Amino acid sequence: MAGKTLYDKLWDSHLVKQRDDGSALIYIDRHIIHEVTSPQAFEGLRLARRKPWRIDSIIATPDHNVPTTSERKGGIEAIEDQVSRLQVQTLDDNCDEYGITEFKMNDPRQGIVHVIGPEQGATLPGMSVVCGDSHTSTHGAFGALAHGIGTSEVEHVLATQCLVAKKMKNMLVSVEGQLPFGVTAKDIVLAVIGKIGTAGGNGYAIEFAGSAIRDLSIEGRMTICNMSIEAGARVGMVATDEKTIEYVKGRPFAPKGAEWDLAVEAWQDLVSDADAVFDTVVKLDAAQIKPQVSWGTSPEMVLAVDQNVPDPAQEPDLVKRGSIERALKYMGLKANQPITDIQLDRVFIGSCTNSRIEDLRAAADVAKGRKVAATIKQAIVVPGSGLIKAQAEKEGLDKVFIDAGFEWREPGCSMCLAMNPDRLGSGEHCASTSNRNFEGRQGAGGRTHLVSPAMAAAAAVTGRFIDVRELRNPA
């Protein structure tokens, strides 16, 4: 009998009932909620005269709509947008009513859901984790079964602690070798998406493995798993190892004492068996990956920084040719234009993909002693949580950014999506460390280019895309 993949093990350990129609009922260990997808779910509970089944499994924080400027210091009443103000207030009210742990807007522990969950130790190896947000795959970096759910499913999990789901196929993405200097986890995942496309992972749970993945920090692994959904996969994961255990140890929600010892023992099995069979295997050579930049309106439209924008006339597939033509028109680019010739208007360093302390350190390392280019209208740095902000300030990173001409903000989702005051104007090009570059994602008519934090900082100080390795020396 063939061995099991990590995904198989996680699925089997949470399976409550297999149903005749091919779907299954799975148990949920951790439910993370925010202000956008939870209000309707709580209202549904009230209408059905139900209460949350397991209060201690839920943590909450507002993130999508919260302002990242000093406006927030005036409290919820100071939020200018009426809908945003109502959603943040409703989350507070619902959590207060049911006794749910919430890190409110001005709590120093508040932040982006996919940053604070791991930061607090609320995400643990072997758990099943859901949230009403597609980037919940981030938590798979801990050897957890994690994926986003819709609002109706948020209500279902609140009421029953279970979820109806169908088992996915197994994909292994193996990245072997040593990454070149200046190449990061963000570049790996963009390269993966460029290789398999945004539909490549449809119907799969992706396990990321190989020496290059093992060499990444836990924060780097979170970046990789975060963008699994951009590759078409709801689930992305990395097997548990000593780095995972060391990261979790001592965090507020982590087990303590004898329970910790038992947990660590159980976590040793959270790896794919040596003889496990994957339905699909994708291989990348880490040494061949260069700093990546997305040029179009889909994450799969990505190239190395030293390449040129594609020429649709050279694409034989009529559907792909049409997609390239539409993307070029929306992005205001020309066929064969060098990536390094793209002029930028704004720079955003933040989001659940790249707002952790290592991301900020990498960006600050590039920004130190330099100035934001005069052609850049705005460059903002948004920490993923209040604790990360405090740590960065302790290290003096805020001063590095401010001295260089960046704006240093309060935590939140910010310019990743146009649901708060941070957004692009029509026609503006932005170097962004976020995860999506769809039309209008950062504001109506806005043009998003996905990059790593170091590449974003390099773009800010030069006004265009440049290989960050030209500005840094190997240690």
UniProtKB/Swiss-Prot annotation:
Source taxonomy: Bacteria, Pseudomonadati, Pseudomonadota, Gammaproteobacteria, Pseudomonadales
PROSITE patterns with a match to the protein in the record: ACONITASE_1 (PS00450), ACONITASE_2 (PS01244)
Cofactor(s) this protein cannot do without: [4Fe-4S] cluster
Documented EC number(s): 4.2.1.33
Primary role: Catalyzes the isomerization between 2-isopropylmalate and 3-isopropylmalate, via the formation of 2-isopropylmaleate.
Biological pathway: Amino-acid biosynthesis; L-leucine biosynthesis; L-leucine from 3-methyl-2-oxobutanoate: step 2/4
UniProt name for this protein: 3-isopropylmalate dehydratase large subunit
Binding note for cofactor: Binds 1 [4Fe-4S] cluster per subunit.
Family: Belongs to the aconitase/IPM isomerase family. LeuC type 1 subfamily.
CDD domains: IPMI
Keyword field: 4Fe-4S, Amino-acid biosynthesis, Branched-chain amino acid biosynthesis, Iron, Iron-sulfur, Leucine biosynthesis, Lyase, Metal-binding
Organism: Pseudomonas syringae pv. tomato (strain ATCC BAA-871 / DC3000)
Pfam families in the record: Aconitase
BP terms from Gene Ontology: L-leucine biosynthetic process
SUPFAM superfamilies: Aconitase iron-sulfur domain
Reaction catalysis annotation: (2R,3S)-3-isopropylmalate = (2S)-2-isopropylmalate
GO molecular function: 3-isopropylmalate dehydratase activity; 4 iron, 4 sulfur cluster binding; metal ion binding
